């Protein structure tokens, strides 16, 4: 593993702060992450944001094949050269934004393992994208800023509890693997990073249109986080008034003056059921 600073200096490049680029520079940490991903020679792997290849190279040596999606054209060029230098031929490198990548077309229904060191500015968006594509995912081993992982596992009523918490807890289990300090990266980030394993449930209470409606309700509730649920549900995407929202909350046995961050996943399911049952009436 070539030190990221050396690779960048050789190409007269700098990490792009606006893309949240902090490259893993410790080979032991990279091997640990790849090992925890449980990759075998039968597995297809998706790597999100491979950067300079810290995870790509050891993962590709274990996998059947690996698809790496990198937004930064400069890094894609450097990584291609590194793969050639290592004589690695089972990597497909795609220069694209992962948020614009169609995973169904890319993998055609095959189960995949997902790995990646995710920049903070798109971490939540990537997780929501993975939730939408979870039918493809065998498991995911991902690295985020520690703060983001605490939001995923937060409990109702806490400051960190939000839309991401509810959605992830509804459809997955998340396990901490390791915390990585700033000195293991180049350039050094200002905060600690955490590696987590995400395993999506085989089945969930809802699917298809019904699940999309649940997610819509959760998003609406948190869109006006400081307001009571009666007010946060009114208007916006749900297009109901405060009288109707109060009635729906009463049906769901939820106090209308509570706020979004106090509801459990089960309570959001009840709220969604109540809204869904009224959705075709003149009141909604």
From Swiss-Prot:
Subcellular location(s) per record: Cytoplasm
Q: What is its EC number?
A: 2.1.1.182
Does Methyltransferase appear among the keywords?
yes
What the entry lists under PROSITE patterns is as follows:
RRNA_A_DIMETH (PS01131), SAM_RNA_A_N6_MT (PS51689)
Query: One GO CC annotation, please?
Result: cytosol
Binding of S-adenosyl-L-methionine, residues: 22, 24, 49, 70, 97, 117
What keywords are annotated for this sequence in UniProt?
Cytoplasm, Methyltransferase, RNA-binding, rRNA processing, S-adenosyl-L-methionine, Transferase
CDD domains, alphabetically?
AdoMet_MTases
Where is the secretion signal located? none
Alphabetical list of SUPFAM superfamilies matching this protein: S-adenosyl-L-methionine-dependent methyltransferases
Task: Tell me the SMART domains matching this sequence.
Answer: rADc (SM00650)
Its catalytic activity? adenosine(1518)/adenosine(1519) in 16S rRNA + 4 S-adenosyl-L-methionine = N(6)-dimethyladenosine(1518)/N(6)-dimethyladenosine(1519) in 16S rRNA + 4 S-adenosyl-L-homocysteine + 4 H(+)
Instruction: State one molecular function term (GO).
Output: RNA binding
Q: Note the InterPro entries from the entry.
A: KsgA/Erm, rRNA_Ade_diMease-like_C, rRNA_Ade_Mease_Trfase_CS, rRNA_Ade_methylase_Trfase_N, rRNA_adenine_dimethylase, SAM-dependent_MTases_sf
Specify the enzyme's EC class, one word: transferase
What this chain does, per the entry, is described as:
Specifically dimethylates two adjacent adenosines (A1518 and A1519) in the loop of a conserved hairpin near the 3'-end of 16S rRNA in the 30S particle. May play a critical role in biogenesis of 30S subunits.
- Stated family: Belongs to the class I-like SAM-binding methyltransferase superfamily. rRNA adenine N(6)-methyltransferase family. RsmA subfamily.
What is the name attached to this protein's record?
A: Ribosomal RNA small subunit methyltransferase A
Primary gene name: rsmA
């Amino acid at each position: 593993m070539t030190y990221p600073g050396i690779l960048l200096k050789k190409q007269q490049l700098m990490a792009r702060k606006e893309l949240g680029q902090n490259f893993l520079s410790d080979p032991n940490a990279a091997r640990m992450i790849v090992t925890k991903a449980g990759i075998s020679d039968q597995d297809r792997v998706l790597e999100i944001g491979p950067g300079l290849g810290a995870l790509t190279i050891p993962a590709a040596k274990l996998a059947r094949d690996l698809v790496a999606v990198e937004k930064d054209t400069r890094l894609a060029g450097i990584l291609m050269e590194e793969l050639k230098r290592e004589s690695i031929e089972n990597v497909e490198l795609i220069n694209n934004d992962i948020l614009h990548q169609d995973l169904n077309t890319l993998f055609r229904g095959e189960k995949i393992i997902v790995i990646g060191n995710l920049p903070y500015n798109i971490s939540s968006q990537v997780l929501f994208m993975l939730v939408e594509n979870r039918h493809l995912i065998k498991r995911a081993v991902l690295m985020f800023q520690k703060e983001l992982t605490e939001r995923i596992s937060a409990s109702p009523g806490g400051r960190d509890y939000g839309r991401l918490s509810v959605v992830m807890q509804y459809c997955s289990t998340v396990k901490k693997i390791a915390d990585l300090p700033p000195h293991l990266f180049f350039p050094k980030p200002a905060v600690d990073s955490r590696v987590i394993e995400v395993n999506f449930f085989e089945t969930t209470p809802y699917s298809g249109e019904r699940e999309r409606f649940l997610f819509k309700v959760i998003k609406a509730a948190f869109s006006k986080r400081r307001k009571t649920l009666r007010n946060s549900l009114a208007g916006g995407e749900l297009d109901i008034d405060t009288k109707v929202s109060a009635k729906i909350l009463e049906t769901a046995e939820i106090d209308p003056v509570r706020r979004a961050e106090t509801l459990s996943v089960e309570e959001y399911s009840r709220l969604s059921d109540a809204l869904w049952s009224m959705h075709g009436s003149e009141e909604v």
